[in-house]
Amino acid sequence: MAQDVLTDLHKVRNIGIMAHIDAGKTTTTERILFYTGVNHKLGETHDGGATTDWMEQEKERGITITSAAVTCFWNDHQINIIDTPGHVDFTVEVERSLRVLDGAVAVFDGKEGVEPQSETVWRQADKYDVPRICFVNKMDKLGADFYFTVDTIVKRLGARPLVMQLPIGAENDFVGVVDLISMKAFVWPGDAKGDVTMGASYEIREIPAELQEKAEEYRNELVEAVAETSEELMEKYLEGEELTVEEIQAGVRQLTVNAEAYPVFCGSAFKNRGVQPMLDAVVAYLPNPLDAGPVKGHAVNDEEVVLEREVSKEAPFSALAFKIATHPFFGTLTFIRVYSGRLESGAQVLNATKGKKERIGKLFQMHANKENPVDEVVAGHIYAVIGLKDTTTGDTLCDPANPIILESMTFPEPVISVAIEPKTKGDQEKLSTAIQKLVAEDPTFRVNLNEETGQTEIGGMGELHLDVFVDRMKREFKVEANVGKPQVAYRETIKRKVDKVDYTHKKQTGGSGQFAKVQLSFEPLDTAEGEVYEFENAVTGGRVPREYIPSVDAGIQDAMKFGVLAGYPMVGVKATLLDGAYHDVDSSEMAFRIAGSQAFKEGVRKATPIILEPLMAVEVRTPEEFMGDVIGDLNSRRGQIQSMEDATGVKVVNALVPLSEMFGYIGDLRSKTQGRAVYSMTFHSYAEVPKAVADEIVQKSQGE
């Protein structure tokens, strides 16, 4: 690397490139790396050569799955770029990169405008107050419309765009942009694909006559927005004085850093036009690590005690681990954002989140998947670390003498799960290693060992998410596994009280026999309150010796593991032992255990047993025009609509829907709403299954 890490933090930018799938985000990143001199040959996503798409599946699918961190230099500034995925199933990657960014470039497709995933990512960026500039890409595409895209930024995102450039020409005739600050035209001559300099040089010309009027109109809007940033500028503006270029740039920077407005640029990354002015804008308008002020955290033992760390080399060390990746040679790489202090390789740090000490191995600045070793890490930068054993995504690393916990990230609960089992005995060990590593990388995968079936279940954020999991397992860890269909966890319970069940267990087999007699009553408990089981002993006068009573209880619990209807675990039952009898020689703990178990099975059959299913609280955010379709669809899934509310530009529908009806929902929702609606789903409660559905479940369990 030609330059070392810049120590002047005013000249550092930690940015993300965020966009909808296919808006040209990876191509834009590639061009940035090309113009900043990191790459000598351009990588194109559609031939699988892009630098940041470095995992095998990404090359195949042409979508960016993991955010690789890349460092480059422009105009004497260092830019650390995090490439983020644009697919809805990978929102956790986006969340975790936004948490550690200072600013972002939002890339939009000039033909499609603001698309659903851009909406989702934009709202996530709002959550972390990330300042953004916008790049309207693909201006060379048929049907590209810059003004339409700017309009969708207002209508769909409720954001305030600051138009900084106008396109010159459109589609095949797109040749450059009008810069509204200098009021000059930047033109990339010739066919950029055949141009030897690959669009690296552009000519500065006068604005074409047909655009002069439009350019003046948009410049006035820009100057007016800037004038509002201070009384001094407002006065100057009202008196008809021209604002200087420096004043306009300072005003735009202030609006951007405060996330009050978003400068909009345009170009075609694929045709190498418009990328350099956008890089100039990253340097001119996006914040440096010092702009956000000291980083806030809390004391290790008390969340109420707020702690601060200055963004400087002198402050105590603090950093956030925001991504774990498995590297073919080094093993586990932990990506960290250093917020304060400095650290040399070999030093010891405290993982404050887990309360464990870690030793730092090698330190790198990353360029996609090439590494540049460094001797120390300093505040304000992003690095990859080797040698951390217990650190996972969202953990805080800090100076052991000055512990602090930085705000972590919130990860959603998985909405879908599949059973997975190794094809051979030899795959068993590989499978557990693979699962362990993949879960450390992505905390939205959850692993659960199903005690009822003995299978390992993997939960994730969607079907594509689980596909990629299985795919990586096969490819990176060479595990062959069978993957089952998504499953629902049903339960069984009873509806009415049974006053008295008598059961005698008697066996005579030469020598000592077995004898136990019990009398029990059973009644339903409130499952909504989470009451699973209760046992009461009401026997008087020693009719059942004290040492045998726990055995009756244990026998009932044995029987509850498999319900009488379809074999699902039972919940919500209270059992009372009323009476019984024993035999001095033939009674034993085992005899009473069997009696309890059999009495329970007999009693449950008389107590109107039913099947319960998990109900999910589903929230759908949809543009108003699809509201009817969304509600109709939820009703057809046995959903109960709970409420409908307004949010920025969308309607929010809340409903309770059985989990079994939600499989495949994401695909249906996307097709019904042109992909513009998003939903989230969390477990709510268990509820009784309608008779027709229960019959089906029982039949299925008997048929297996």
Swiss-Prot record:
One GO location term (cellular component): cytoplasm
GO biological process, one term: ribosome disassembly
Gene3D superfamilies (alphabetical): 3.30.230.10, 3.30.70.240, Elongation Factor G (Translational Gtpase), domain 3 (3.30.70.870), P-loop containing nucleotide triphosphate hydrolases (3.40.50.300), Translation factors (2.40.30.10)
Chief subcellular location: cytoplasm
Swiss-Prot/TrEMBL keywords: Cytoplasm, Elongation factor, GTP-binding, Nucleotide-binding, Protein biosynthesis
Protein location: Cytoplasm
Keyword Nucleus: no
Residues reported in the UniProt entry to bind GTP: 19-26, 83-87, 137-140
Superkingdom, natural source: Bacteria
GO molecular function, one term: GTPase activity
Boundaries of every tr-type G domain copy: 10-290
Functional note: Catalyzes the GTP-dependent ribosomal translocation step during translation elongation. During this step, the ribosome changes from the pre-translocational (PRE) to the post-translocational (POST) state as the newly formed A-site-bound peptidyl-tRNA and P-site-bound deacylated tRNA move to the P and E sites, respectively. Catalyzes the coordinated movement of the two tRNA molecules, the mRNA and conformational changes in the ribosome.
Stated family: Belongs to the TRAFAC class translation factor GTPase superfamily. Classic translation factor GTPase family. EF-G/EF-2 subfamily.
Family matches, as HAMAP family: EF_G_EF_2_B (MF_00054_B)
PANTHER family reported for this sequence: RIBOSOME-RELEASING FACTOR 2, MITOCHONDRIAL, TRANSLATION ELONGATION FACTOR G-RELATED
Annotated protein name in UniProt: Elongation factor G
